[in-house]
Structure formats: C-alpha cells, structure tokens
C-alpha cells in the first residue's frame, strides 16, 4: 500500500530528533482556495501539515489576491504547520534543511526597480487578454493561452498602460514569494513554461520567440528588454537560493525559524501535481481536479500542429508536456453542496463536510450514464476551451429530463471534467496521442471511486489514484525540495520511482463501456448547448 501522507511511519521520539536536527523538507503551495504546507523527512514521509484557507477577490473587473493577504496567508500557513508539529511531537520548528514554494501558475505580477507592485496582481482566472494572446500565437506559431504571463504583459502594452514603462521584473506568484524568502529572481522551468514558451533542449525561454517579441514592441521604445525582466529559469535539482533572515521572519512571526534553508526552484501547481503522482515519465499523464482542472500528458515527440485548446508546458525537469486546462472546475459543484449543507442545518441536522460530499458523490453513481439529459456549466469565470471571456454558472433540464438527485450531482461532476476532455480529445483524435493511464489528484478524488470513475469514462483509459493524491502539490513541492539533496545521484524520474514511489500502489479504475458512451453523449450535448452559456453571459448581468 502507499505510504500514508499524513503520518510518519517512525516513532515520535525518532521523528522529534529528526526535526530538532533540521533534517526535514518543507513545501508550501498557494492554491486557489487554500495555502497548504507539508513537512517531510528524508524518505518523503509526511511529518506534519499546515493549512490556511483564502479566496480570490473580484475587484475592478479582475480576479486578484491583495499582497497583504499573500503575506499574511504565508505566515498563517507556516504557523499552522508549526502548531501541528508542536502538538504531535512536542518540538518547535527552528531549522529546515530544504524548502520550496509552489503556486498557481500564470497571471501577471509586474514590479518596478524597488520591487513595488505596479498594477494589481492578476491571477490565472483573468481572460482579458484575447487580443494579445491571438496576436502572439499567430506570430510565434505557438499557442499562447489567455492566462499566460506574456499575454498579460503584451495586453498591457497594447492598452498603453502607463506602468509598463517602469517594469523591472515580471513574474508569477511562486517566483515572487521565492524572491521574498531568498532575494533571488528565479523560477522553475515548469512554472516558467506558463510565462513564456520554453525550448526544452536549451532548458530556457525560446530564444527565437523572445526575438520576435522584442521586434513586436520595438516601436514603444521601452527602457527594458524582455530577457531582462523575466525570472531566471532553473530545473529540478538545482539550488535556487538560501532563506534569508528577512525571509525567515516573513515565514515565522515568532522568530524561531533560522535562516539558511536551501530552496529548490519555485514551481507551478501543474509541475508539483506531476511530481506528487509520479507522472513525469514520457507517455504518462495526470489530472489535477480542483477549482480549476488540468490534464497533462508527457510527450515523446512534438505535436504536428498547435491548437488554441492545448498548452505546451514542461515537467519540472524540462520535458515537453501537452496540457488541457479549464479555468472552471469544482467551484459550482462546491456551491451546490453548500446549498445542501444549508438545507440540512435548516432541519437541525449537522452533517460534516466530508460526509456530505461523500454521500452526494457516491449517490451520483446511481444516476444514468448520460446524466438523464441534465446539463450544467459551472462557469464562475471565462473558459478558454469554449472561447468565453466571462462565465455564469448555469443548470439546464428539459421537462422530460430525468431530474433526480443522483443525475443532478452526476451532471455537475461530469461538467467539471468536460472542458478538459474537449482538449484531450484533440490530442487523441488529431495527434493520435495514446493515453495509457492517467494519475488523478486533487479534491475531486477524495471520495473513493467516484471522480476517478468519471474521469476514466471521459478519457476511456484507466485512472489511478494514490493515497497521497489529496495532498497534491504541497507534497509535490516538498519532494522537489528533497530532490535537491539527491540530484547528484538520480534523475528526477529515478528519484521518484526508486526513492519515493518504490513501494507505492494506488487504486486503479477502468470505467464500464456504458459510462464511456454516456460521457460521450453528455459531451456532445455540452458542446451543442454551450451557446446558451454564451447568451447567459450576454444577457444576465453579474
């Protein structure tokens, strides 16, 4: 069986000694709704977990997180794991040998020479870059998605925003936090691949595309060059900086944490998800299922063409990856579960969130394979795959639809996966990419056998979920921090296979043929009715 991610297999006294000597590895990941910290030993076994919940804000037409919430969230999450360690082992965290930062990819953070933020942080959820993304994609002959950092930067240029002239550094959330902790403007290659296209041979930004971009903006006569304002690209295993005194103070408001921890390259949540599911080998894939959804397939060759629906990114080791990404995942689903929670409280019934999700999800298995002609669009924001810049959560049924609770929940679960399926269908149908197996991780897979079965139906391939799956990227970035200490002995693939997942087995499910056909029917209905979603954006004001 897989190692349990929330409990070390050693005795408490032995763990206490390990913590006191500082031979431990910390990963912190900034997700969309939760900042999570995971502390491991040298075997990758989890010693403690810290959590800080947060939410993005929709201010002045953009999705953002204020800087003060980023900083307070960082220290709150660290305080949470510090308490967890103290309660479990009676020891105070003071030394941490290696650590790493991960965060949601893409978006736009632009700073001046004094590292003052020049414009509000725009997250990956913002799709207000249509003109820029289209122009760059045509110029590069490479798909530039709406949420990519270079699309945001170029859109600001096209809009002639005044702050652009004063830019000294443009980066992502993980790289910014890494800078706060170390003073180094570095980034992991996986996260960098969501800023600007990557050359997997050079392990750096694509030089020819940088030149094309420079030519496109020469008329503006900016005092900077694109190569000068992007973070330095680094690959897994490299030392990307050392925790400074000020960085330690940012993390630990009590002042107990010592400076000097070695940091791995900061990575994006896509890359840490690949690590956490041991899916960085060529031909393997993984699906991250949470408030956003993305499926990633590590390629053994380049694609023949480029597609708007497919992003080309990389593993933390730099290998090319095709990604089908959806901005919208389980947010609408979670909102409906919240409604059922409110209903139960109205009758004085107290049900834990875990039980509520488990009962509703499991009951959906009793629904029809095609969801009984029910349809859902859980669009809290725009969706690139269906070419929508805004979204409205929408539920549809006809008078003859099979309207019951099982089909209702099943439709929302299917819908959360369908946009990603549309992208994957392009790879399998137009590029003849074979999906041998998909590894699942994220909140959707916490209820055993439900999200896993539906994903298998969507892709018509086996889906495996490890016991570590719900820990996701925070554990993944902790493993990347651990890998820095092993990089002289193993490739990243070897390290994960031989040192971390050598005894791991997960649960694997292959959907029934009727579920596969049912999902195909649902997907076709989804595509046939997406214009109703488009009309709702036009007619139904926020």
Spans of model-derived segments:
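Short glycine/proline- and acidic residue-enriched helix-loop micro-motifs
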Residues: 63, 137-141, 229
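Carbohydrate-associated surface elements
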Residues: 126
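Short beta-strand-loop/turn "lid" adjacent to the catalytic site in phosphate-handling enzymes
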Residues: 86-123, 143-145, 178-190, 194-199, ...
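Active-site core segments that coordinate phosphate-bearing ligands/cofactors
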Residues: 8, 12-21, 26-27, 93, ...
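N-terminal glycine/serine-rich phosphate-binding loop of ATP-dependent small-molecule kinases
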Residues: 2-120, 166, 227, 249, ...
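Gly/Ser-rich phosphate-binding catalytic loop and adjacent alpha/beta segment
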Residues: 129
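Core alpha/beta catalytic barrel or barrel-like domain that forms the active/cofactor pocket
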Residues: 48-49, 222-238
